[in-house]
Design a protein with these regions (language model features):
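Active-site phosphate-binding strand-loop segment of PLP-dependent enzymes
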Residues: 10, 109, 120-176
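Active-site C-terminal subdomain of aminotransferase-like
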Residues: 15, 193-275, 289, 358-359
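Conserved active-site segment immediately N-terminal to the catalytic lysine
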Residues: 169, 183-194, 203
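A glycine-/small-polar-enriched, mobile loop at the entrance of the PLP active site in fold-type I
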Residues: 3-54
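PLP-dependent aminotransferase-like
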Residues: 77-144
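PLP-dependent enzyme catalytic core of the Aspartate aminotransferase-like
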Residues: 2-4, 317, 330-359
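Conserved PLP-binding catalytic core of the aspartate aminotransferase-like
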Residues: 284-315
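Conserved N-terminal alpha-helix of the aminotransferase class I/II PLP-enzyme fold
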Residues: 33-79, 86, 100, 108
Length: 359
């Protein structure tokens, strides 16, 4: 069977060349006579893999020396607890609620102190990003938290909030490495890799060193302390070794594509193909305020639930899979991450045009 066009929100499409490289090395990684899956994480060979992955990520993002790169487990959901456990030293933090994942992070943080919801777009079903230029930031807040790209609702912070000097913590799971980023604008950014970088099971955090301290909330487990992972080079315990190996290959693929500036141009072009069609269509329409549209996740509807279901079924039969919208929203959603080729989006639009003509 030929490969389908996979529009899943995560786990998601990976570069085909990366999959081919991994397949070629599955039984024998560079003359070791074993797979990376079987390799001791304490071996020199694996140490070289994780060191190269970190070096390539630093090159891609321009990460300054005073930021640590941590490869961890637990996904973004575990970070909902780790962030307040490690950073909420005064037991106060401010959260901007622009979707399901920011809301979950905020609810988790309330278990550890005062988590203020300083702004929200819940009033319009998270279809826009609120003005964050002059927020009522708590003077005692240890950080301001956002989910930068909202996978479910298809919105994106195109301008970071004015945190009034407080460290910005950002969940970038679904826009990680989709465009250049000024790391110095963040105290911390993190993301589960299963959307835009690699297989599920790895979360990457980039944290300013002054935020990594022993001064954590009482009772914080050893494994949930950033300092534990920073002091041990992400090797305190057995890391998600194979997942990190795949991430490293994706970093090298991105470098070969020209880096994040080049991948942004490609992503802008892809998104334009789909958004231009949605804006002109008489049947399909987008659900997000135009200025806040994501380049990665594009939700759309017909306005008729039965017709939506018919479209999803027909699309799957035609080789366009995982287009069903999130269970909390309905409709459709096309996740067009870095590895989705432009031709995949164009062919989807061609299919949508045909479906519109026939319905």
């Amino acid at each position: 069977m030929s490969r389908v066009y996979n529009f899943s929100a995560g786990p998601a499409v990976l570069p085909e060349s990366v999959l081919q490289e991994a397949a070629a090395e599955m039984l024998d990684y560079r003359g070791t006579g074993m797979s990376v899956m079987e390799m001791s994480h304490r071996s020199k060979t694996y140490q070289a893999i994780i060191d190269q992955a970190e070096a390539d990520l630093r090159t891609l993002m321009g990460i300054p020396d005073n930021y640590k790169v941590l490869f961890m487990q637990g996904g973004a959901s575990q970070q909902f607890a780790m962030v307040p456990m490690n950073l909420m030293k005064t037991k106060v933090a401010d959260y901007i609620i622009t979707g399901q994942w920011a809301k979950k992070a905020w609810q988790e943080a309330k278990m550890y102190g005062t988590a203020n919801a300083v702004s929200s777009s819940a009033d319009k079903t998270f279809s826009y990003i609120p003005d964050c230029s002059d927020l009522p930031i708590d003077e005692n807040a240890d950080y301001v938290y956002i989910c930068e790209n909202n996978t479910i609702y298809g919105t994106k912070f195109w301008q970071l909030p004015n945190t009034k000097g407080k460290p910005l913590v950002s969940d970038v799971s679904s826009c990680f490495l989709s465009e250049p980023v000024d790391v110095t604008k963040y105290g911390m950014l993190y993301g589960g890799v299963q959307k835009n970088i690699g297989p599920a099971g790895v979360v990457i955090a980039v944290i300013r060193e002054d935020l990594i301290t022993e001064d954590v909330l009482p009772g914080t487990p050893t494994m949930l302390r950033y300092k534990t992972h920073a002091d041990n080079g992400s090797m305190y315990n057995t890391p998600p070794a194979y997942g990190i190996y795949i991430c490293g290959k994706v970093f090298q693929w991105l470098l070969s594509m020209g880096g994040l500036e080049a991948i942004r141009e490609r992503n802008v072009a892809k998104a334009k193909v789909l958004y231009d069609f949605l804006d002109a269509s008489q049947l399909f329409h987008g659900t997000v305020v135009k200025k806040d549209r994501s380049l990665m996740n594009v939700p759309f509807v017909t306005g008729d639930a039965e017709l939506d279901a018919k479209f999803v079924k027909a699309a799957e039969a035609a080789g366009f899979v995982s287009l069903k919208g999130h269970r909390t929203v309905g409709g459709m959603r096309a996740s067009i991450y870095n590895a989705m080729p432009v031709e995949g989006v164009q062919k989807l639009v061609d299919f949508m045009k045909q479906f519109e003509t026939e319905n």
